[in-house]
Amino acid sequence: MMKDNNVFCRLDTCETVGYATTICCNIIETLTTNYMTVIQVYVGDKHWKNIENPAKAIEIIIPTNTKKIIVENISVNCSYSSKLLPSLENETFLKQIGNKTECSLSSFADALDGNYDEIRTHYPEVQFVHVYPFNSVQKSMSTFIRRFDSTVRMYTKGASEIILKKCKTILNRNGWRYCTIFKC
């Protein structure tokens, strides 16, 4: 927890915690499970809600090519130190190691029948053409990869309100369409 800047302000809190292995609190001191999931997405002109259950995520109808793009984007734009490990017998979710947001995205990619480990093997970080790391001002990050057909593709992840303002086209069920700032 210290590594993630989760510091106790009162000594008596530390003494009370004792030998706990994981305790996560938000700003209003509510205990959480230290696990994040994707709960809604907007893909192919459709808003999918309540997909935190992997069985629900499977119900999402997305064209195969679009799924591949989503899974590839998640795979190359998540830190390679973030991983999903098999859950223990008494746990229902995969064990998330590393950044919880990235793990939740990786879990979503997995629910879309994507194999982020395989993609990470095909695109090792050392072979990225360029990476613009996450920036709190721009609220996004981008990774450029050289694809197998020698083309270069840029993948971006970040705050939707920032990214959508920069989009000139959007991929929907019927392919690419042009959009304006307010009509994406």
Regions found by a protein language model. Give the residues of each.
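Conserved cytosolic headpiece of P-type ATPases
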Residues: 1-184
